[in-house]
């Protein structure tokens, strides 16, 4: 109770079961800035992977991954700005909130695309290349139908989609980069604690954003290091 009283201005009460948490103005600002500052690095990083690509398939994969990475931070930032400054526009805010949830599914699919597209897979495992996008489409339909109604189910879908391709990736003969992939996944999982702690921990959602940024950086590093050319080769190519 003493903790809550001390930090009351930085945190509102918990949201009801089927409702949304209402951040304080401080939390709104933190939610915006923690992802807004990552938009430019995401764009630059995506362009670098495209520049390092050796063939058309690597370029396509770089674009898929880059678009998912950039879309995550851009859509998240726009939604939190609208939620903060234009919350009276209920329909607009609701649409952007749905987009914010839907883009997570496609970001997960895009994050696995380099591993599924550029590594040799077995005949059964190769089906995950398209199945993960089918899962993303299913998640999008779920958001349209049941947005904010069954939050635990939504979280279960995110975690299932995050872990299912990992089972395929870990079965590859070439295991380079899998430690980084697992490390990033662990960071995401730890961040979920804060994702579900609005109204319990001040700035919980902004802290979740930092976990997302850290995990995404770890995964980007693994993709850059193990699936695309080394920086020395890049400099030599220039």
Curated annotation (Swiss-Prot):
Record's keyword terms, sorted: Endosome, Lysosome, Membrane, Receptor, Transmembrane, Transmembrane helix
Residue ranges, Cytoplasmic side: 1-28, 83-101, 145-151, 196-198
Residue spans, topological domain Lumenal: 50-61, 123, 173-174, 220-238
Segments crossing the lipid bilayer: 29-49, 62-82, 102-122, 124-144, 152-172, 175-195, 199-219
UniProt-listed InterPro entries: AdipoR/HlyIII-related, Hy-lIII
GO molecular function, one term: pore-forming activity
Gene Ontology BP terms: positive regulation of neuron differentiation; regulation of protein localization
Topology relative to the membrane: Multi-pass membrane protein
Localisation per UniProt entry: Late endosome membrane; Lysosome membrane
Major localisation: membrane
GO cellular component labels: Golgi apparatus; late endosome membrane; lysosomal membrane
Family: Belongs to the ADIPOR family.
Job of this protein: Involved in the dynamics of lysosomal membranes associated with microglial activation following brain lesion.
Protein name, per record: Monocyte to macrophage differentiation factor
Organism: Mus musculus (Mouse)
């Amino acid at each position: 109770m003493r903790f809550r009283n001390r930090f009351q201005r930085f945190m509102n009460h918990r949201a009801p079961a089927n409702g949304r948490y209402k951040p304080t103005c401080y939390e709104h600002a933190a939610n915006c800035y923690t992802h807004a500052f990552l938009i430019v690095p995401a764009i630059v990083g995506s362009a670098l992977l495209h520049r390092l690509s050796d063939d058309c398939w690597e370029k396509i994969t770089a674009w898929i991954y880059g678009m998912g990475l950039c879309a995550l931070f851009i859509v998240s930032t726009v939604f939190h700005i609208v939620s903060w400054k234009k919350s009276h526009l209920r329909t607009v805010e609701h649409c952007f909130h749905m987009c914010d949830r839907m883009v997570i599914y496609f970001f997960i699919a895009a994050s696995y695309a380099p591993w599924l597209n550029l590594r040799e897979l077995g005949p059964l495992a190769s089906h995950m290349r398209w199945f993960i996008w089918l899962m993303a489409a299913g998640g999008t339909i779920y958001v349209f139908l049941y947005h904010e109604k069954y939050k635990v189910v939504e979280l279960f879908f995110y975690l299932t989609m995050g872990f299912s391709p990992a089972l395929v990736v870990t079965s590859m003969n070439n295991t380079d980069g899998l430690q980084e992939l697992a490390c990033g996944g662990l960071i995401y999982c730890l961040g979920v604690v804060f994702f579900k702690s609005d109204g319990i921990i001040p700035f919980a959602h902004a802290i979740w954003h930092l976990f997302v940024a850290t995990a995404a950086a770890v995964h980007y590093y693994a993709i850059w290091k193990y699936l695309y050319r080394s920086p020395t080769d890049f400099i030599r190519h220039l």
